[in-house]
Amino acid sequence: MDLEAVKLAFRKNFAEHGELGASVSIWKEGVEVLNLADGWCERDEVRPWNSATIVPFYSATKALASATLLMLLEENGLSPDDLVCRVWTNFPNSSATFSELLSHQCGLAALDQKSSVFDHEEVISAIEAQESNWELGDGHGYHPRTFGFLV
């Protein structure tokens, strides 16, 4: 593992791309082998960024959720080209594939009903009760609040 290249890329992100604040931690076989933190928590440069700075994770979980879904599909003899409704019978878009779901094309980017994101069953019920916001093939829309529930 070339940790010097990681350090260089980290510094370059600040010097050449205007990074405000960032940190990275790399672990190998249960041992932290790199811990970098630099920058500021806000543009006013009041609080320095450190390795304990708490930040929203947002879309970083999408890759992990997608990888998990793809592994589950493979383990169960399914393909990304299979229909979501094969495993989620109440899925509101009966012609959507897992590939379309994972690439934000299934038209369920927002919830029609007001639902608490802390109530999983309520959100799933809201998703199942709504119609797609567009026809498959006609659009694409980032699914920031529904993606995790869809997966």
Outline where the language-model segments fall.
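Alpha-helical scaffold elements that line and support the substrate/ligand-binding pocket
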Residues: G30-V31, P56-L78, L101, H143-V151
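Active-site helix/loop module of the DD-peptidase/beta-lactamase fold
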Residues: P56-A60, L72-Q113, A129
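Catalytic-site signature segments of enzymes, centered on catalytic residues
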Residues: T53, A110-V151
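N-terminal core-entry segment
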Residues: I26-A37, S99, Q105-A109, V117, ...
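Alpha-helix N-cap and coil->helix boundary residues
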Residues: G21, S79-L83, A96-T97, F118-E122, ...
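Short, conserved catalytic-motif segment at the N-terminal edge
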Residues: M1-F57, G77-D82, S125, A129-Q130
